[in-house]
């Protein structure tokens, strides 16, 4: 027993095996992303910046049912419904989300019967002032227009589980 221990320490077998292990990982491709310039894949269930969607004909989807406002645990959503139209439908006059209060739980998205409010793939929406985090209807519709292709793709991938 003493001879083998002395031989191992003299021949530095642990050092050599550790060196070759390090060299094996040194030449493998790096799993680290250079973040601002490279972005990794996002899950279809990712909950990012909110967006209001439109129908393909350009009409907004929100029917002013106020389910998202009722289900929001943070009370971050404020909706004012407009008067009924001649065809019996309603639309929102005011749709505000206080992103400072929002906890990104996704309950508003789950409650919406027409998939009008969604949490999109954008996670880079840092601001310099709090006021920029109060989203009105125009900002939400602009987000929906900007991210519609990715939102539709993610919703299609997630459809079997809804």
Swiss-Prot record:
Any single Gene Ontology cellular-component annotation:
plasma membrane
Catalytic activity, per the record? a quinone + NADH + 5 H(+)(in) = a quinol + NAD(+) + 4 H(+)(out)
Keyword 4Fe-4S (UniProt): yes
Which GO terms of the molecular function aspect are on file?
4 iron, 4 sulfur cluster binding; iron ion binding; NADH:ubiquinone reductase (non-electrogenic) activity; quinone binding
How the protein sits in the membrane? Answer: Peripheral membrane protein
Q: Which GO terms describe its biological process?
A: aerobic respiration
Record has Secreted as a keyword: no
Superkingdom to which the source organism belongs: Bacteria
Describe the function of this protein. NDH-1 shuttles electrons from NADH, via FMN and iron-sulfur (Fe-S) centers, to quinones in the respiratory chain. The immediate electron acceptor for the enzyme in this species is believed to be ubiquinone. Couples the redox reaction to proton translocation (for every two electrons transferred, four hydrogen ions are translocated across the cytoplasmic membrane), and thus conserves the redox energy in a proton gradient.
> Whom does it interact with, and what assembly results?
NDH-1 is composed of 14 different subunits. Subunits NuoA, H, J, K, L, M, N constitute the membrane sector of the complex.
User: What is the name of the protein in this document?
Assistant: NADH-quinone oxidoreductase subunit I 2
